[in-house]
Amino acid sequence: MQEIRIRGAREHNLKNINVDIPRDQLVVITGLSGSGKSSLAFDTIYAEGQRRYVESLSAYARQFLGQMEKPDLDLIEGLSPAISIEQKTTHRNPRSTVGTVTEIYDYLRLLYARVGKPHCPECGTPIQSMSIDQITARVLAFPQGSKLQILAPVISGKKGEHKDVLEKIRKDGFNRVRINGEIRTLEEEIVLKKNFKTSIEIVVDRIVMKEGIRSRLADSVETALKQSEGLVILDDGSKDHILSQKMACPNGHDIGFTELSPRMFSFNSPYGACETCDGLGSLLEFDEDLLVNDPELSLVDGCIEAWAGSKSNGFWFMATLKSLSDSLKFKMNTPWKDLPEKTRQTILYGDKKIKIEYDFRGANSHYEFTKEYEGVIPNLQRRYKETKSDSMRQWFESYMTNHPCPSCKGKRLKRESLSVKVHNVPVDEFTSYSIEKALNFVQNLKVTGAEEIIAKPILKEIHQRLSFLNDVGVGYLTLERSAGSLSGGEAQRIRLATQIGSRLMGVLYILDEPSIGLHQRDNTKLVSTLKNLRDLGNTVLVVEHDQETMEESDWLIDMGPGAGVHGGSIVCAGTPAEVSKHKNSLTGKYLSGRLKVPIPAKLREGNGSKLQIIGAKENNLKNIDVNIPLGKLVVITGVSGSGKSTLINDILYNAAAHKVMKMKTLAGKHKTIKGFENIDKIINIDQSPIGRTPRSNPATYTGLFTPIREMFAGLEEAKLRGYGPGRFSFNVSGGRCETCEGDGILKIEMHFLPDVYVTCEVCKGKRYNQETLEVRYKGKNIFDVLEMTVEDANQFFENIPIVKRKLETLLEVGLGYIRLGQPATTFSGGEAQRIKLATELSKRPTGKTLYILDEPTTGLHFEDVRRLSEVLHTLVDRGNSMIVIEHNLDVIKQADWIVDMGPEGGDGGGLVIAEGIPKDIAKIKNSYTGQYLKKIFTSSEKISRKTK
């Protein structure tokens, strides 16, 4: 069969559609946001592909995977096994890195274990093997009278009962062994748990250092070395000294090297992980800047919020500080910033030499005692360790930040592991390289002789994976980068590279906007990668809005014609050229140039004020100075990884939130920022969910639900029954269904199977009890209203201005199709961001608000971008300021001011390439953004000339 045939697809808003998708082709599904693209691609095609695969498994295997629901459709034929590559950043584990999720780090560990050269952690000298005489001499260096045990390690951290090993030791004539640090005699019956890791060392000899011991010592050392294949452990009662025939420092430093193995380089294994931070590379510690949120305040005013704001101990803490001030002779009403540095350090970290006198007088009691001053931070650390309350733990952690581990300096591994080098490069240095630099290192790595035979297959795997990652446009990422810090687009492209590396054939790949976060320059690489996946013999189905990807596809499906209830149909399907000529296709009109997002005729002058970021040097920023004019739409551009988000989110937003909004945020490294007096509020409108539970919805988030509940409470029927606004809330007792507690569904725990959700039988999913649902407005009860789309509700509430105004803002941002009570968890990142924008639009303007948006065009069609642009312009026209981080040229060309970062990503970025109005940026040759803007302005001029 040459195509995937779909008949009668009705999932979500799909209108009983029929569509044929050619197999082994690059197929793009496009259309307005909410038109049904994901419903077709993921909820129908992928879901059915997955379901059929699971159905083919045995009943035993299926019980662990659960029952998969069949999508609502009549027929689907020609389906291949389906793999979905979505935008979600799934790796929230702090131990996951780019290196681990791509499996490159697994091969690196193998490479360093097999061809790495160990060096002494103390002096850096290459480690050499020791002879028996050298080992004996090292033991003889212990002082006279020292009591030593000479041990031979035979099992090192391996699971099993090890009966045969213990039996052999017994037969060899030894009486004692040390098992997991405990001395045991072989006369007793030793039973080990087979699922637990065990270390076993033979006790070869126990000696006291004295004259004439050399001969006995040499014999014991030789015996130990034979039993353990070249390793001897000296136990002096306080620590173990590992000496090896294979590895020893020629300068005599005591080092703990065992045989090199891959687990030595794993920060997830106790054999490789730094013991201080357990391989995390950082420690959660109390931060001075978070504890003292406002240095302008004094101790009396509560500058140390964690003590001053404590409900239970606030009086005690303030009395402690008052006694300390009497002792150190400082005033409690002096602003924190004006106190001497030594005094501030004493207040925070304590001083055991200082004794505080306490004098508490109550109505019937009087306490007097003296106690050493503990200090704010030691006090909080002690209470943090002692608490068993999750809420208290969270409260403490709000004053804490991650700091690099003092032992491993953030490198995650033990110093012995960090001392192993391949061509003078330790493993931590390799992982600090960008993918592009690591690829270059591997290509130029020369190994010879026996090493070449061992390293060649390992290097081939590393080289392939690095090449695939570089090809999908993430060459600027480092292998040590935390997987949780990746954007959705970056995470998706990494998974895409992994799939290409698997070289599967006959698979249906379904991708969700892989171009997210990519500069136009890197799009060509991505399209080539998708074509490579197709050329392997796969069908590649991409939900995408990027023009270049559409034009390079083999087949284009345009969904619509509108969004939500107005969508769900196939407007047209064909080659990109055929779609661009279709008269009813909105996508076709934009592809052919018949419709365009307009370029503003005039740029804003701004209000004359600006924000000045001076000396920014967080991550890859190169100590740069940047001016952000206020009262304008400012767009930050640059290739992926050039430092845009670091500059705006990590430095500017965090600094402004701390200074202006008094939030507990820590800004990235910079010298200073000037101009905060020109703004009174800063709002980061990101793509995070509007709520974490199904109880959150657009009505609750935008504030619509309150006036709607008040309106219902004001109805005659509600007044007669004595119902207030709370009666119409599903979050509190009274009007909600108590069986499901207002959820409408019940969760049934299935233990080893996934939880099952069933509709509540009492309220039939309506969330409210019968009495509440009897109160109606225009024939509709509160449940009916929550089920309405924004578009329907706008007509329904046309006579209630406060509700209508909020609904109109949702319509303005193109969300007329969403339901008022739609669970927050069902919205895409782009939809969540536009709900937040609508909420801001409905507020009264102050004219001094700074808005920050990071890639707001994610998930948006050309037409959605045009609508979004109008909303952004409306907010700026009210006198506010806006900073947008964006790659979409339709937004960039509308900017009043552009800051272009680069020139490359990662180490090659972090500089300001150009600042100015769009037409000036277009003239700058070394600006990648400028090169693409130049094409747009040249094209627009040609069209305007033809029009004239």
UniProtKB/Swiss-Prot annotation:
Lineage: Bacteria, Pseudomonadati, Spirochaetota, Spirochaetia, Leptospirales
Protein name: UvrABC system protein A
Record's keyword terms, sorted: ATP-binding, Cytoplasm, DNA damage, DNA excision, DNA repair, DNA-binding, Excision nuclease, Metal-binding, Nucleotide-binding, Repeat, SOS response, Zinc, Zinc-finger
Family note: Belongs to the ABC transporter superfamily. UvrA family.
Pfam family, one: UvrA_inter
CDD domains: ABC_UvrA_I (cd03270), ABC_UvrA_II (cd03271)
GO CC term, one of those recorded: cytoplasm
ABC transporter domain: residues covered: 307-586, 606-934
Superkingdom, taxonomy of origin: Bacteria
This protein's encoding gene: uvrA
Binding of ATP, residues: 31-38, 638-645
Chain positions of all zinc fingers (C4-type): 249-277, 737-763
Subunit structure as annotated in this protein's UniProt entry: Forms a heterotetramer with UvrB during the search for lesions.
Keyword Repeat found: yes
Function recorded in the entry: The UvrABC repair system catalyzes the recognition and processing of DNA lesions. UvrA is an ATPase and a DNA-binding protein. A damage recognition complex composed of 2 UvrA and 2 UvrB subunits scans DNA for abnormalities. When the presence of a lesion has been verified by UvrB, the UvrA molecules dissociate.
Annotated compartments: Cytoplasm
GO molecular function ontology, one term from the record: zinc ion binding
GO biological process: nucleotide-excision repair; SOS response
InterPro entries, alphabetized: AAA+_ATPase, ABC_transporter-like_ATP-bd, ABC_transporter-like_CS, ATP_grasp_subdomain_1, P-loop_NTPase, UvrA, UvrA_DNA-bd, UvrA_inter
